Structures are given as structure tokens and as C-alpha cells.
């Protein structure tokens, strides 16, 4: 889904899948970061009840997790600890966000990177604790700005901790043909855009 469809173009480049599926009652939605996480998630999800959707990266996914990684159902992962800003990313955008975290660190900005592995249900506790600590948040997703991670985080904050949310997302556009790196640039999803 998303830009990992690359040269298959718009017919394979779903930027609205999460938004559509979030509206289905009892649906659980995972946005996997890399192959290691996909493998771990499938092993656990097979033993759960109810409908699940796993958004799986294609061959272009940059590895984030190693073989010692342990996936926890419906939990976000804190990838880096920080005090100045919270970056909540999902799927392939976790790797891009990690690059941005390193650039910010060079400037003395401490970013906490959270991998929102589950978009529905959202791990509100982990995400909210981080946002309350930093008081600044940006979401990063390989999905339409409408109905995905940005929407889920914003909906939570409206009720629990009103705060402006910055976003890196596909800005209400359709997919198109291109190489992974070209599409990252075209849709403004690069680590430089996050930075």
C-alpha cells in the first residue's frame, strides 16, 4: 500500500485503506514497519478473534527491527527517547522518521520516536504519555492525511489533551507511477520533510 507500490502506480497505491477500514466496527488495523515486524505480528494475530488488517511493506521497506524484536499486540514501540518533540510514525515512515531524529539530535533537539504499530485501536497511553512530556507532536504516515494516523491521534487529543498536531502525510492526492525515492520526494514524505 501507499508509495511502496512504486511502478505499479495509482491502481495499486492505496492511500485511503486505513481510513476506510477504521470505520468498520471491531476492526484492528496494523501498519507494519518492516519484514521482522510483519513476521512477529502474523504469529500473534493468528490467535486473536475479530477482523484484522495488516498493512505490509513491500521490498523497499528499510529494516528497523532486528531478530530479537518482540511484537506486542495493540502496543506502540518507543524507538528513541526524547524530551523536545514527539514523532508518531507508522509503517515505512518509522525508518524515515528515525533519520529525521538523528538530524534533529545534531542540532540539540531531543525527539521521542514512537512507532504506532496499531492504528486501531491506537495505543493512547504510550502516545499520550510522550506528548504530555514534550508538548509538541508530529505524525508521519504513508497514507492520506484524512482518516489515518493523523486523524486517529488528533481525535484522541481533542478529547484528552487538546494540542496542535503537525503532520507529514499524503495531502489528499491519488497515487502515481514512480520509484520509491521519487515518490517519497513527490509526496513530501522524506526525512528532510519531517526534519
Language model segments and positions:
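Thiamine diphosphate
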Residues: 5-6, 57-195
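Conserved thiamine diphosphate
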Residues: 1-86, 111
